[in-house]
Amino acid sequence: MTLTLKKRLKNAGILTAVFIVAVIIFSYVTNKGNDNMTADMGAATFPQISFSYGEYKINTLTGYAKRMDISSMHNTITPVANQSLDVNVEAYGNKFTGASYKVYTMDGTSQLEHKKIKKVGKGFTLDLSGKKVLDEERILEVRLNRNGADPVYFYTRIVSDEDAHVTECLNYISDYHENALGKVENAGVGAALEPTDDADNTTLQHVTINSNYEQVTWGSLKPQVEQGERWSIKELNSTCMSVQLQYRVSCKGEENEADRYAVKEFFRVRYIADAKKTYLLDYDRTMEQIFDATQKVLNEKGIILGIAPANLSYKVNKDGTIVSFVEANELWNYNKDSDEISLVFGFADAENTDVRNMVSDHKIKLLKVDAKGNTTFLVSGYMDRGEHEGEVGVAVYYYDIEKNSVEEKVFISTNKSYAQAESELGEMSYYDAKTDMLYTMVDGTLYQYSGEDAEKKALVKGLDAQQYVVSEDGRLIAYQANGDLETATKVTILNVETGKKQKVTCGKGECIRPLGFVRSDFVYGVAKTEDIGNTVSGEATVPMYKLEIRNQKGKVIKKYQTDGIYILSASFDEDMITLERASKDGDTYTATAPDYITNNEQKTKSNIALETYATDLKQTQVRLTYNDGIADKEPKVLKPKQILFERPQTITFSDKDAPEKYYVYGHGDIQGVYTKAGDAIKKANDYNGVVVDSSQNYVWERGNRNLQYSITDKDDVLNTIKDRLKNQEKPIDILKDVNNGEAYDLTGCTTEEILYIINQGRPVIAMLDSQNAVILVGYSDTNVVYEDLNDSTRHSVKYEEMDQMTSGSGNTYIG
């Protein structure tokens, strides 16, 4: 080797060493005080369990990292045969030192059983023969103790399979599912349907029992199931069974040879033992295309989303060049200028086919896309993998488009079920990246959390559910700033994005109520304090004589006022406001016909819009259309890294003072949370579902009642109700006294909807007008039975006639 070459190598080595030292110093300086690194989201590590029932593997359960609130765990129900239950364990590499299980009452207040399992292996059997363990529906908690890791917890409701005909129902569902997939003719698929003229037979995205045979049998898609179905029994009693199947299918494509879809398929069935036949009571199936950026997803018009919901969530930047959108529980970002498309967030993706990551017990909510395309979003519910694997809560994330990274800003942890986290915490939270502030409403307390100094403070406390409203995007919160519901004279509108506040006040002798938002326009009502009274049921009410809509500039853009008519409440559906109205009779307000207001606020125009179009194979499809088109149709696919902190910020909130709530479950998922039982029942009826209260007591179930029923041996109770009604006492107070402090306002329900309440042995007061009432005490398959207040003679009228009789009170029932 020549001297010159040696010298060059020596100099090169010195330069390399200097460069490495410089990089280390630069890295230290730029990261000083910020202990973080970037990495892919970690793989799932938790085991899973399922249960065997005959030849079926049912209710595959995901594990929780900590003990959960028993009374909130409603997701599945597992039938128990012969007082024992076979548990299957999918270890996924975990080693176990043992297991244990406990059985609780539904409200979680009483533990009925606790036993230990020494050897886990591939499964074990639970002995449930203990006293009172299976007397009625219970909650089962299974704990797996892992070697070298924290224990994992699993929850399901359990019930005896006696008279439930579980095998017959599961067989029917399995056959129907397979025959629909295979388009098998004369196999009972079409015969079980109930086609109607108003069913939408132009889309495969959502089909129901009212759809036609062609839609239910997947059109021309020729689906093939991938990795099997996940069977979950959602409701089970002696009259019917509800089951949800979740799976993925590969179908014939158009732009691509094949497309993949996430599917949820719901069945509600009944087995009639005498006829030895199973009947389909309800059917509901949704499918959503899994966006695969490695295939053709762009054309000259925009981004092809395929078969997807027509109201798919998306937000665009100011220039209309960048869009973030959510499809099949994955968040994507497309930048037209840089020709890049990024999978911002998703537990399951093309590279990760672990079935544990395909559990869709979470929801992604877009909060904001700024001018550069940076995206702020929430993930609420159960966390399949990553930093918070096995936890339930709300994670706040910030996607930095220039750094191609996703940073978790804060995690709100809860011990409630994923369904409650989604519907409550997730809907009431907002994060602003500029100020690094999180705002969340928890049971009437508005909290502000600073990410910079990790401090939490309550801005407003003690608000009733009717005292505040939150805009759909969570950016605007309006609340009564002084007094209570009946006396507040001021409402504060807080823009959590800017921190700015607006005040709205009313006149002397008046009170003001926030009602809601139509996009960014604030809707509120004004009442006169002298008008405050009661509804026919006896519930206190603040009747508003006028309603106003105010824009963000503080200008009133619409008023609603009708002589002699008062507004009791308002509900919102996009740009439509439905007003529940009443007329006055003394101090009592009797419901009258609702009215409707359409707000004409113009949507902000953008270069990007969500549109639908149709093709022969896939029928109705969805596209994010660029008005100026797309030139390059082969984008660069990016997968952002996650920024991981040594000490991620996690916060919790207390809900010890939470008011009574009613949870609606239907079609396999939670469908709403209400503070009034009647509203919950009406919603549940739309989904053939159930209503439970905060302690998991069943308030209402579709169809689970006797065909005929009569309340007997309660003459003393009925006489007490009659005497107190004659004394003009409030119906709601009377029934609270006779029902151990519990009474349901069922106003607005139909007679047929409240038969379940009567079947529980609870007399129902039916108000004929503001003063007169009858007591419902029984029913047949067509008629309802009632007693007048002045005697014990029982009268029978058709359901529809009773609805007509109570129309003078706005169909007021109290049970």
Where are the language model's segments positioned?
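Short loop/turn segments that connect beta-strands within beta-propeller blades
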Residues: K336-D339, I401-K403, S450-A454, N495-G499, ...
